[in-house]
Amino acid sequence: MNLPTLWTWILPPIAGAIIGYFTNDVAIKMLFRPYKAIYIGKRPLPFTPGLIPRNQDRLAVRVSDTIMGSLLTPEELQKLAKRLLDTERVQGAILWLLQLALKQIKGDRQAKTAEILAAILHDLFGESLARLLKVLARRQDFLEKQINQIFDRLVLEFSLSEQQARQFSDWLLETVLPADVIRLALIDFLTDRNIQVIDEGFREKTSGTYWVVANLFGLRNALARLRTFCLDEKDLANTRIKELLLSLEMRNRLKNWLQSISLQNLPISTVRQLRKTTRDTVRIYIQESGEQFLQDFGQTIDWDQIANLIINRLQSSVSMTTSLGVISQELALILERYLEEDLEKLVAQIIPILNIDQVIRDRVNATSPADLENAIQGIVKQELQGIVNLGGILGLLVGLMQTIILIAQNPG
């Protein structure tokens, strides 16, 4: 067997294997090369640029349609949204936001935060709440339950303790009704006319032994002497009045009387009317003066100081820090219940807003042919190497078949 004949048999398998192995790489390069059109004069050469660069716009549309039609369908987007909006993930995100907000309050923005909070509080209590109360006060049942509850628990059940009654009676006898005030009241009361009226009434309405005393002696002289005594002997009169109050145990009597005062002793109809009067008085006052009262009251408050106190309290509050987890969990559960009902509608509304298909087209069109080629070559080398090897094997088999045919045709 001579060398040319041997080469005739060996060359087809080798050539077939080489061609089959490198066909994919050559085919890919032929799809992209050249990247730009080559001109002879003003006429471009045929098949320039490559197939993909020449039809890159149409390729972008096809890629976008394929992805949106097969991969990113509304159902898949819903599943993706459910995975992304898992309760634990949402809770973690909300907790992070709350902690970030708390850190912002603790940081350099405290003054700004306090200023904003002060403005909110001033508007809420000075303006918004005042207008709201004025509108609500027009209703006949405005604060009815609340006022009735306050009346029943505080006013109706109110009674003085023994110590309070003692202090109150001491205050009455020492400040409101001291001996000197009682003496002056007696002087003012015992005018000539009042003395005459008392004496005549005593004479006319008594009978028996008292009638004899009243008509023989009367009360005129006794009352006149009492008035003169109070006028002339001030200190002595005050001393006698104090002794009289002490002898009559007025302090204890007054204390016992104060302790016995209770609205529960009144008739039920009177209590009901008193409750209704209290409720109507409060409602009418709020209707007429409530708005102005709240506005004036709001002007007297240092809202900046209040805001700073609130922020400082939040900063040092352990319960505030520990409650962030509970708050984030509750908010996450609320969001989960909402998404269970309306996730399909939300996804249908979000897809046109995101405009994913146009984003895909823009990205494909913005990618240079060289980058596309490198990306496809990388995929082929990393993920489709088996196809490349298979091409080499098929080329080898085709070459062997050709060698067999040649041997069969030339047996000698």
From Swiss-Prot:
Q: What is this protein called?
A: UPF0754 membrane protein MAE_37850
* Entry keyword Transmembrane: yes
Annotated PANTHER family: UPF0754 MEMBRANE PROTEIN YHEB
Which keywords describe this protein according to UniProt? Answer: Cell inner membrane, Cell membrane, Membrane, Transmembrane, Transmembrane helix
Where located?
Cell inner membrane
Q: Does the keyword Cell membrane apply?
A: yes
Residue intervals passing through the bilayer: 3-23, 387-407
Q: Name one GO cellular component term.
A: plasma membrane
Origin, by domain of life? Bacteria
Query: In what way does this protein cross or attach to the membrane?
Result: Multi-pass membrane protein
Family in the record: Belongs to the UPF0754 family.
* Annotated source species: Microcystis aeruginosa (strain NIES-843 / IAM M-2473)
The lineage is: Bacteria, Bacillati, Cyanobacteriota, Cyanophyceae, Oscillatoriophycideae
Which InterPro entries does this chain map to?
A: DUF445, UCP032178
